[in-house]
């Protein structure tokens, strides 16, 4: 009987079982290890490739940003961070010759709304603040809300311009989101009506519209500057980028004397009122320099408040309105006749009645014969007509032109007229030659007549006029004989003595009054212009003055009655205010030599008359 060793068998069986149950010795796990190894390697490679591709993309993008599209992207960045702030240039001031302000810019504020921001921030919901804002702007709350809602797509809407700083500061304290305050300026005119026609005015944006404000606008405006900075998201400045220099506006110093200007305006305004006239104008000129010291027109207007002002009130009639100068040109006829040698200084002229082209030459105070002095003292139309007919028309036209008639004054003021002279005409009728000698058939502005008398006052030296201060004085150009011009000035003193109303106490004055009928629609009408033009003091002339009263309707209309007293008041004030030495006492001791009386009938010499 065979016996098996059961214990050995069972031991072998156990050993086999241990080997089978140990995971590290299981044969079927070997392929699994190979798969895991391949997967990990592939994933590593994929990750590496993706990272490399990402790096390449970043490098490419950086290259694109830095080189290909750098400007565009830089601009986009600048839009988000750069801010350009304006550095405002304040409009220059207008000063009188002594530095007194005639026009100045006053700081104000503009109230601006950003409707987009206001609606986005729901600013309109704050009824209390909106109501307070509306009240300060002079609007109802409902109107303000409607205005903002109507412009809901706008980012910039003016609510008010030129608001006083006290109001602006109150509005700023309301802290309404979308309400912006901007600095601006408003023009202020201290002399109001008195210098309105000379200085002019600007619009709400500071652009010159009339007068000096317009003529000298390029000097007065200057140029705004700017400052460019970079800001962070909180609005803090992190870098100063650049500055654009501002060019300050220049002040303009006028030849006008503010004290004289004010006085002249008051006198003209008073004369217009007392004579129930359409208007009045006066121009005062410094004979030595050609500077316009005063130029006033009445009625005037308030440039600080032009609401409802008629455009005709804004005209500077001293330069825009032309008139037939009447007898104010007669001294130049006598001057021309003496210069041309067609009359002797002591000659007696036939001034009896005569007709030309069927029309009688009329004198207000007719006399049979008169000296040159008497022709001007009595303002004889017949006398100057006789003289004019002795000369070619070109002779008188040349004198008028040398005195400045028909020529612009070149003050630079807008709207200036040059008048009518017709100096280049080839054919003249005798009646035209005669009427031109007493100021009909030609036209001039008051400023041109003032320039002509300034030429007489400088004893024949023509100087250009200036509305700005002149330093040093202009030498000028001699256009008339000094001796003959002094004779004419001496005759004008006799005219003043006879008239009396134009005289100034303590001073020797020379004047010529004139009265001319007005033309409407091409026909003479029963309306008149009353002139008085003259110079003072006679011993050493300093000022030339022209006063014009347009269409006086209170009764008298002659220059000697209407404008002569105004001349006296203005000239007297100017002489005393500037401490011009009196010269009337010297005149009392002078003797006037009696002229030889030689009578001429027409062109023929008659016998001497004592």
Swiss-Prot record:
It comes from Haemophilus influenzae (strain ATCC 51907 / DSM 11121 / KW20 / Rd). InterPro entries: Bact_Transpept/Beta-Lactamase, Beta-lactam/transpept-like, FtsI_transpept, PBP_dimer, PBP_dimer_sf, PCN-bd_Tpept. It catalyses: Preferential cleavage: (Ac)2-L-Lys-D-Ala-|-D-Ala. Also transpeptidation of peptidyl-alanyl moieties that are N-acyl substituents of D-alanine. Pfam families: PBP_dimer, Transpeptidase. One of its GO terms (biological process) is peptidoglycan biosynthetic process. It is found in: Cell inner membrane. It is a single-pass membrane protein. It is an enzyme of class 3 (hydrolase). SUPFAM superfamilies: beta-lactamase/transpeptidase-like, Penicillin binding protein dimerisation domain. Pathway: Cell wall biogenesis; peptidoglycan biosynthesis. GO terms for cellular component: plasma membrane. Catalyzes cross-linking of the peptidoglycan cell wall at the division septum. The chain crosses the membrane at residues 43-65. Its EC number is 3.4.16.4. The gene is ftsI. Residues 1-24 are annotated as: Disordered. Residues 9-18 have a biased composition (Basic residues). Belongs to the transpeptidase family. FtsI subfamily. Keywords: Carboxypeptidase, Cell cycle, Cell division, Cell inner membrane, Cell membrane, Cell shape, Cell wall biogenesis/degradation, Hydrolase, Membrane, Peptidoglycan synthesis, Protease, Septation, Transmembrane, Transmembrane helix. One of its GO terms (molecular function) is penicillin binding. The active site is at 327 (acyl-ester intermediate). This is Peptidoglycan D,D-transpeptidase FtsI.
């Amino acid at each position: 009987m065979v016996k098996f060793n059961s214990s050995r068998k069972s031991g072998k069986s156990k050993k086999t079982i241990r080997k089978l149950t140990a995971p590290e010795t299981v044969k079927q796990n070997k392929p699994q290890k190979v798969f895991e190894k391949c997967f990990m390697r592939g994933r590593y490679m994929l990750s590496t490739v993706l990272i490399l591709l990402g790096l390449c993309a970043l490098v490419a993008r950086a290259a694109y940003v830095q080189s290909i599209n750098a400007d565009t992207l830089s601009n986009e960045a600048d839009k988000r961070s750069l801010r350009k702030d304006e550095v405002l240039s304040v409009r220059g001031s207008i000063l009188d010759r002594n530095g007194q302000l005639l026009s100045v810019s006053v700081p104000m504020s503009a109230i601006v709304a950003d409707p987009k921001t206001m609606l986005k921030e729901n600013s309109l919901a704050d009824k209390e603040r909106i109501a307070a804002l509306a009240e300060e702007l002079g609007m109802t709350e409902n109107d303000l809300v409607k205005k903002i809602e109507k412009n809901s797509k706008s980012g910039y809407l003016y609510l008010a311009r030129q608001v006083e700083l006290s109001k602006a500061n109150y509005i700023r304290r309301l802290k309404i989101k979308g309400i912006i305050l901007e600095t601006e300026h408003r023009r202020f005119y201290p002399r109001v009506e008195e210098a309105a026609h000379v200085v002019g005015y600007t619009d709400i944006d500071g652009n010159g519209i009339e007068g000096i404000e317009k003529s000298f606008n390029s000097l007065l405006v200057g140029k705004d500057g700017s400052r460019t900075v970079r800001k962070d998201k909180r609005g803090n400045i992190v870098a100063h980028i650049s500055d654009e220099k501002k060019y300050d506006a220049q002040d303009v110093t006028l030849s006008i004397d503010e004290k004289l200007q004010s006085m002249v305006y008051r006198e003209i305004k008073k004369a217009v009122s007392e004579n129930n006239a359409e208007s009045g104008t006066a121009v005062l000129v410094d004979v030595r320099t050609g500077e316009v010291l005063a130029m006033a027109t009445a009625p005037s207007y308030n440039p600080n408040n032009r609401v409802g002002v008629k455009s005709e009130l804004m005209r500077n009639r001293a330069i825009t309105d032309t008139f037939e100068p009447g007898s104010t040109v007669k001294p130049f006829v006598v001057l021309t006749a003496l210069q041309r040698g067609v009359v002797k200084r002591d000659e007696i002229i036939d001034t009896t009645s005569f007709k030309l082209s069927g029309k009688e030459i009329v004198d207000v105070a007719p006399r049979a014969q008169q000296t040159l002095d008497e022709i001007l003292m009595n303002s004889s139309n017949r006398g100057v007509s006789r003289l004019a007919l002795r000369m070619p028309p070109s002779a008188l036209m040349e004198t008028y032109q040398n005195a400045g008639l028909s020529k612009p004054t070149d003050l630079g003021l807008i709207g200036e007229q040059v008048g009518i002279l017709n100096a280049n005409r080839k054919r003249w009728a005798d009646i035209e030659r005669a009427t031109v000698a007493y100021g009909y058939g030609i036209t001039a502005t008051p400023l041109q007549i003032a320039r002509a008398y300034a030429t007489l006052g400088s004893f024949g030296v023509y100087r250009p006029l200036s509305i700005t201060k002149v330093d040093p004085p202009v030498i000028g150009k001699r256009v008339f004989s000094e001796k003959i011009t002094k004779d004419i000035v001496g005759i004008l003193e006799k005219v003043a003595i006879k008239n009396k109303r134009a005289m100034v106490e303590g001073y020797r004055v020379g004047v010529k009054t004139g009265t001319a009928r007005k033309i409407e629609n091409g026909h003479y009408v029963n309306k008149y212009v009353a002139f008085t033009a003259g110079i003072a003091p006679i011993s050493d002339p300093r000022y030339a003055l022209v006063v014009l009263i347009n269409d006086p309707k209170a009764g008298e209309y002659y220059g000697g009655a209407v404008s002569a007293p105004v001349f006296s008041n203005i000239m007297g004030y100017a002489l005393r205010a500037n401490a011009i030495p009196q010269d009337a006492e010297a005149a009392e001791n002078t003797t006037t030599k009696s002229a030889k009386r030689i009578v001429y009938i027409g062109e023929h010499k008659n016998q001497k008359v004592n």
